[in-house]
Structures are given as structure tokens and as C-alpha cells.
């Protein structure tokens, strides 16, 4: 295990090391950035301007400029994830706010359970305790349940002219809709809720006709298919697909508190699990992403998992978490998928960011650039900014650079949420609240 730390003798944490700033925009908060050619595509966290997606010309990285903005046509949804392949862009459509939507789905069962227990209708205080929410949020949950939600899915866009994107279709799925996903020129690998399942599963769609995505196959964690008679061995949606990434004839599926799975899709109509590993609850934060290192290291096949630092919901919870392991990067030997072995970890010390204990801000890992060359990983670390990590020794990953954006728009701390690279080696960062940065690793 390695830990990034400047040490007390070096004083306050420096904001950058071997990474230099090139360009910046005070862009609305975002969930994902993807780069294709001379354009960056940004999927937004819910915002007052109702932005769904922004397209940015990055031909001159020192002077990026917005060429198109797509606003949401549905106030009950958000569209914070985006991918591009060729002239096709896909964005997610997911219930907003997600947490309220999930509690709305649970409300009828909670009411029935409490009514049977007490012989009367439950109070808001009882419902709040049962649903794990604040009492003043129960009314919002009740209203959301009364409205229902039928807009979940994904939208396909023609971006052959990036300054003039054209919607092709809104393909609806089920439940609260689609979260993160992967795609290429032929298929979309969608993480979505579907009728009859608990939590997100993988649904693969053929994009031969972008106006009519056609389902090819499904994959899920055993126990999710409740309509098929399966029974989950966990509470709620704790074991579910976060998203799955395609590498060759495999899908690498991050399964939240269920760890990760490796799926053989040589026959894409029949996905087949060939390996799985769950390192929770030893590590308390859920698995956000899993990917294989593109080359063997020391003759072994290596995979990298990155966990997502969960959001503390109160000052008391923030205090209670002190001393708990933050979300981190983990390495695994996956040479034999049937016998996966943990190898190493990489952590960032709270000493390495002046914003690590900013009230209300997250500090810990979230996401990495999901396509890597060589052994360098670029990871988003919330108030720890960007961390550049070399995994050449998977037993002891080491930090080789970092960049912590200065907070903007009056925010007390950066919340670096997502990172992508272009074919020039430039690095693109988005912040959950405000900020789009272009930086370069100089190491």
C-alpha cells in the first residue's frame, strides 16, 4: 500500500506538481466529460440553467469556447453522463433527484409495512426513520411517488455538426432510468433500471439504426431478477451495476457494494460471467469503476478498481467518519479470473489537500480516465483534485503528479468529479459545482 503525503515538514499542501494549467471555463457543475476530436462534451449535474449537455471547441486548449448547449426538456430528469462515437452522442436520462426517486419507489412498501405493524397510517417521523431520510423530506417523497416517473432512458444525438446537435431518439428503459454507460460505433452498454429487477443492470443495445436502438442482451448480478424468482442477499440496491466498460471481448462491470465482475461477450447475445470479486465491506466506499491495465505487468494481468467517496449527509456524519478509510485506487491480479487476488492500494492523505476537511465537500477518489496507455492513471479525487498515478509496480502504485483546481464562484473547495484525455495527451477535468479545466502532465 502507498500513500501520497507531503509530510508536515513541507508545510501546507501544494496545489500542483508536474501538472500545468492550460485553459479554464467557469462551466456549470458536471458529472462527466468525454473528448472526441477537437470537441469536449460535458454532461451536467442538475443546475439552475437546466443545462443537460455542453459542447466545447478545444482546438485551441488555451482558449476553449462553448459552441452548443442542450437544455433539459423535463424538470424531473437530469442528463449528467455523455459518450460520443463517430457522429453519434448518447446522454443519459435519469430521475432527478435520484435519491428522492428511489425513496418514492420504496414508499408504498414502507407504508404497508408500518401500517401492518402499528394498525394505523404511519406518521412522517416513522416514515422518515424507515426510509432513512430527514422528516422534512417525506413530503417531497410523497409528491414524487404521486407523480410517478416514466422518462428514464437515454437520448441519441447526431453530432456530425457539433455546433448544431440534433436529437434522433429518446429511448426509454425503466425505473429511474440510466446512469453511467459505455459505447462504441456499434453498441451501447447501458446501466439502467428495468422492470422486474432491483437496481441497475447491464442492457446492451445495437446502434446499427441509431433511431431505433435494439436490445441485444442483458446481464445482472444473481439476485437482482426478482420477477424471475431471484432473491437478493443484500439490502435495497446496494449490489447493482454502476456501469460496465468494454475492452476487447470483455465487459468490466463495477457493482457498487458488490465489488466487480468480468463478463465474456465474445457472443454478445449471451454475456457470461467469468470472474467476480467483492472486497467490501472491508473497504467501506462502493466500487465506481474497474478496468484492465492494457499491458501485462511482471507477466501478470492487472486490473484497477476505483471507489467513490460517498457524500456525508450531516456534520455529525462527517465527524463520525474521521479515521475511516477514504475511497481509493486498488490493484488486482486478474490473470485467472476465477481466482482474483488483491495486490495493492493507493491513497491520498488529508495532508495533501488544503480542502480535505472542508465541511460539506467530499475528499476521496471518484473516477479515473477509463482508457489508459502504458502504466499512468489519471484519477479525479474530489477535493483532492487530479492525481496522476503510476501503477508499473502494482504492489506499490506511486503518485507522479497532481493538480488541485482553485475553488471558483465562491465555492469553499473544488470537487473534481471526472477526468478525460485527448490524443494530444491533454487532460480535461470537470467539477461537480463549477469548473472545466484543461491541464497537462509535464512529468
Cite the ranges covered by each PLM segment.
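Helix-turn-helix DNA-binding elements, focusing on the entry/boundary residues of the two helices
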Residues: 124
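The alpha-helix within a helix-turn-helix
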Residues: 128
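Key DNA-contact positions within bacterial/archaeal DNA-binding proteins
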Residues: 136
Amino acid at each position: 500500500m502507498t500513500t501520497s503525503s507531503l509530510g508536515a515538514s513541507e508545510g501546507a499542501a501544494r496545489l500542483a506538481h508536474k501538472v500545468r494549467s492550460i485553459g479554464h471555463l467557469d462551466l456549470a457543475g458536471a458529472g462527466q466529460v468525454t473528448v472526441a476530436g477537437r470537441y469536449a462534451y460535458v454532461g451536467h449535474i442538475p443546475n439552475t440553467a437546466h443545462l443537460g449537455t455542453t459542447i466545447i471547441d478545444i482546438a485551441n486548449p488555451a482558449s476553449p469556447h462553448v459552441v452548443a448547449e442542450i437544455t433539459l426538456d423535463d424538470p424531473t430528469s437530469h442528463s449528467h453522463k455523455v459518450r460520443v462515437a463517430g457522429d453519434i452522442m448518447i446522454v443519459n436520462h435519469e430521475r432527478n433527484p435520484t435519491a428522492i426517486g428511489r425513496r418514492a419507489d420504496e414508499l408504498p412498501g414502507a407504508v404497508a409495512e408500518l401500517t401492518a405493524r402499528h394498525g394505523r397510517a404511519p406518521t412522517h417521523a416513522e416514515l422518515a426513520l424507515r426510509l432513512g431520510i430527514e422528516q422534512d423530506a417525506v413530503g417531497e417523497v410523497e409528491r414524487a411517488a404521486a407523480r410517478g416517473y416514466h422518462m428514464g432512458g437515454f437520448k441519441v444525438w447526431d453530432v456530425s455538426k457539433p455546433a448544431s446537435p440534433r436529437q434522433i431518439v429518446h429511448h426509454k428503459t425503466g425505473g429511474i432510468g440510466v446512469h453511467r454507460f459505455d459505447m462504441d460505433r456499434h453498441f451501447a452498454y447501458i446501466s439502467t433500471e428495468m422492470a422486474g429487477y432491483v437496481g441497475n443492470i447491464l442492457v446492451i443495445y445495437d446502434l446499427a439504426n441509431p433511431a431505433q436502438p435494439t436490445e441485444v442482451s442483458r446481464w445482472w448480478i444473481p439476485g437482482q431478477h426478482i420477477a424471475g424468482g431471484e432473491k437478493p442477499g443484500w439490502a435495497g440496491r446496494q449490489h447493482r451495476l454502476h456501469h460496465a466498460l468494454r475492452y476487447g471481448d470483455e465487459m468490466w462491470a463495477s457493482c457498487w457494494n458488490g465489488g466487480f465482475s468480468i463478463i465474456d461477450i465474445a457472443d454478445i447475445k449471451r454475456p457470461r460471467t467469468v470472474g467476480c470479486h467483492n472486497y467490501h465491506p472491508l473497504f467501506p466506499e462502493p466500487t465506481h469503476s474497474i478496468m484492465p491495465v492494457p499491458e501485462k505487468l511482471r507477466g501478470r494481468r492487472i486490473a484497477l478498481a476505483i471507489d467513490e467517496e460517498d457524500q456525508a449527509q450531516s456534520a455529525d456524519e462527517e465527524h463520525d467518519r474521521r479515521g475511516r478509510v477514504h475511497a481509493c485506487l486498488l490493484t488486482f491480479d486478474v490473470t485467472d479470473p476465477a481466482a482474483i487476488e488483491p495486490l495493492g492500494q493507493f491513497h491520498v492523505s488529508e495532508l495533501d489537500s488544503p480542502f480535505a476537511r472542508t465541511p460539506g465537500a467530499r475528499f476521496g477518489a471518484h473516477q479515473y480516465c477509463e482508457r489508459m496507455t502504458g502504466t499512468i492513471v489519471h484519477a479525479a479525487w474530489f477535493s483532492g483534485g487530479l492525481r496522476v498515478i503510476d501503477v508499473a509496480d502494482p504492489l506499490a502504485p506511486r503518485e507522479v503528479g497532481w493538480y488541485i483546481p482553485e475553488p471558483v464562484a465562491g465555492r469553499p473547495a473544488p470537487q473534481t468529479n471526472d477526468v478525460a484525455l485527448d490524443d494530444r495527451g491533454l487532460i480535461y477535468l470537470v467539477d461537480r459545482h463549477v469548473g472545466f479545466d484543461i491541464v497537462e502532465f509535464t512529468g
